[in-house]
Amino acid sequence: MRKTLISSLAIVLILQGCVGLETKKEAFPMMYPPYEKPVSMVVVPAINKSTAADAPELINSTLTMPFADNGYYVLPISIVSNIFANEGILEGSQILGLPASMFKSNFGADSVLYVTINKWDTNYIVLAANVTVGISYVLVSTKTDEILWSYDHQIVVDTAGDSSGVILFDVLKTAVTTAMTDYIPIARQVNQGAVVSLPYGKYHPNVAMDGEMKVVSKRAKEQGKSQMVQ
């Protein structure tokens, strides 16, 4: 009886874990046949809504690899950023509202990726400390101006370190450890976490074979999309 109860509970928990999830094809149908999947993407300067001035640089420096690993050709972000800077565009909000087709004519890219940094907070609670990072991603077709993929991803990373058992020492250690935190791995982590939901691109060995992967949070998809209308 007890074993049956435990088994039933396990099934319920598994089913609950699947609630609110969609397959990649259900969530992003325009990334699968008969639609034409984008091959290349240009990343515009990040929109920074956080209080961390260096957040855009951290995110931009870690964006290329996860999207390239997922099968897309990403135009070199440093070169693209310099081109925008020469035109006086330093922030993504300056580009919002412009037709995506301009990126096709100017860069030859099939898609444009908009990135919004919603949160980059360092939190201290006596002996505990963490960094919370929340990013929204929206991929738009430069041919149709339609949203192909959108996602909102947030992570919380503990920066306190191990306890020594001495409260005063631990308080000082937590402050120092958090102040010296290397944020590059955190930026990589949030980008990689979001890309899990992105359908594989042309250069990935499993392209068009991931449509039934049920890994897309409906809530995260809609929150990401909402950034384009704010």
Regions from the language model: what does each represent?
Residues 105-120, 126-130, 138:
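Mid-length scaffold segments of soluble, non-membrane domains
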Residues 43, 67, 115, 137, ...:
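Buried hydrophobic packing residues in well-ordered domains
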Residues 38-40, 50-114, 146, 150, ...:
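N-terminal segment of the mature soluble domain
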Residues 18-39, 106, 142-230:
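C-terminal/domain-edge helix-coil "capping" segments
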Residues 1-18:
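Sec-dependent bacterial lipoprotein signal peptides
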Residues 46-48, 72, 79-80, 117-120, ...:
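Solvent-exposed coil/turn segments that connect beta secondary-structure elements
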